[in-house]
Amino acid sequence: MGSGASRLLTACTCSRPAPASVDAEPCLDDALGHSFCYAAAATATAHSSSFRHGISGAALSANSSVPVPLYNASAAAGGVAPGYSSAFHTSSSFSSAPLQLSNLSSGPLFLSGPIDRAGQLSGPLDPAVPFSGPLPAKPPKPASSSSRGFSRRFRKPSFGSLRRSVSEKNRPCAVPLRRDDGVQWAHGRAGEDRVHVVVSEDQRWLFVGIYDGFNGPEAPDFLVTNLYRFLLRELRGIFYKEADADNKKLWQFLVDGDDDDSELDFSGSGRFALSLDRLKESRFHMWAHAAADESGREWGSRRLAPAPAVRDHAAVLAALTRALASTEAAYLDMTDQSMGTHPELAVTGACLLVALVRDDNVYVMNLGDSRAIVAQRPDDGDDGCVFGTMRRMEDVGVGLEIETRPGGCAIIGLKPLQLSTDHSTSIEEEVHRIKREHPDDDQCIVNDRVKGRLKVTRAFGAGYLKQAKLNNGLLEMFRNDYIGDTPYISCTPSLCHHKLTARDQFLVLSSDGLYQYLSNEEVVLHVENFMERFPEGDPAQSLIEELLSRAAKKAGMDFYELLDIPQGDRRKYHDDVTVMVISLEGRIWKSSGTYV
């Protein structure tokens, strides 16, 4: 049955009390995906190190019937996994809404943006006010382009503008309660894609993880639950240091203690003598494998003292590598222990993209073909002239007016700089590396795939292409001819440190589905032009709309015809896609004295 997303959009209201974190209910076309944005809390201006980035995100699901994960973080924490393919969970400074897409040829709809927090909106909104409904028959008029740039896009609207958003845009929303611990988080899923965002106002850092799963959702779910937790441990002493240990609660001493088998005996009482392992297996097992929102909440409750500015950038990259190695080892160990009951875990995996922003430093780690791009103004010696892109640029659906110079080159204001490295059989160096590592296997690359299975050459999980014992535990139809002991798929990431300068305007982080239809140059050009014309629009959702428009055009169908194709079947036309646009305009951190 088709999703009917383009025509059947039923109304829903935010009628239940809002806890400290609110899950966006699967209303409207929530199964299609969701958009979200980060809006700093009203109290942030009082902090000396307030976060100044604007974050716009969107996720699109092509798969609706994602199987229930064999590894389920929510169930491990005592919850029940929801049965829909797209969901989003946030703390207070994030707002989220189901995707509401429109055909770009008729003009974009701006249905995502910060929620005003100046009007004492720290609790649930009036349930009588419908915050969602059918798309308007005509798209709203675009905002005036007289004032341009990201600064308008991410400034806080007045309460009157919120009312206009309700009446004119019929926007569904979730307004969680305010949190005061300085840590804000969001995580969501769309098909087999997962996204995890953590903002630490006090520590002046931003963590973004985009995990593009394949052969099942178990690997990306495991990454959301565990990678940030491992990374935070590795960053101790680099990004932060523990405050006075005397202020720790008892359970924090227990969790942070050494993993030995010594008994804890409070002398004289005789009433509390349990081993640390036993405590972790009971009360603290939930902490160890809690859902990803607990990563933000548990660590946010700890007393952390700011560390000095980072000078050893290699130490940060090494911490990222160690955190990934620990997460991978834990996942493969879980897979090994589950082979008797759930051998399917051996084939599940994920491409990975992590961006860590601290002050004016960006650290990127990636496996697979997801990408991180920074849009830069040309330097003084660069005339901004780009050849060979005219034919593709005319497909960008936001009414571009491209200036040309003699010789047929297009002039653009911003250029893309890719911070990640693609790992696939399309990269000649990767193919040569695998063949060098497997000289006795002339079938290591078959049909442009590793062992005829995967297009990517580096990934998280996928144990059947890393360990012979995991491969041999599969049914014969899934088993590879595994020769030797060397992994066919590597978990060695590519790493990058980038120092932000006045040239850098925004970051675009995305899973590979975006680049099925757009090049790096087109992505930057689209976001730049869109935000100049519609400063209050949603650049991430606009990229999703552009992707769908191109997919429909390539398939020879109407935009809404594509949306009405049942999810699962629509996977033939586009992949699950997660996109994040992070503005770098304005001061990065209030305390850093750095302007971009």
Swiss-Prot record:
Reactions performed catalytically: O-phospho-L-seryl-[protein] + H2O = L-seryl-[protein] + phosphate; O-phospho-L-threonyl-[protein] + H2O = L-threonyl-[protein] + phosphate
Can you quote the record's cofactor note? Answer: Binds 2 magnesium or manganese ions per subunit.
- Which domain of life does the protein's organism represent? Eukaryota
The organism of origin for this protein: Oryza sativa subsp. japonica
Which Gene3D superfamilies does UniProt cross-reference here?
Answer: PPM-type phosphatase domain
Annotated EC:
3.1.3.16
Q: What is the lineage of its organism?
A: Eukaryota, Viridiplantae, Streptophyta, Embryophyta, Tracheophyta
Q: Which CDD domains match?
A: PP2Cc
Q: What is this protein called?
A: Probable protein phosphatase 2C 26
GO biological process annotation, one example? signal transduction
GO terms for MF = metal ion binding; protein serine/threonine phosphatase activity
Domain (PPM-type phosphatase) ranges = 177-584
Q: Give positions of region: Disordered.
A: 122-154
User: Could you confirm whether the keyword Metal-binding appears in this record?
Assistant: yes
Locate the residues binding Mn(2+) 2.
Answer: 212, 512, 575
The record's keywords, sorted A to Z, are: Hydrolase, Magnesium, Manganese, Metal-binding, Protein phosphatase
* Stretch forming the signal peptide: none
Classification via InterPro entries: PP2C (IPR015655), PPM-type-like_dom_sf (IPR036457), PPM-type_phosphatase-like_dom (IPR001932)
Residues binding Mn(2+) 1: 212-213
Q: Which cofactor does it need?
A: Mg(2+); Mn(2+)
Family the entry assigns = Belongs to the PP2C family.
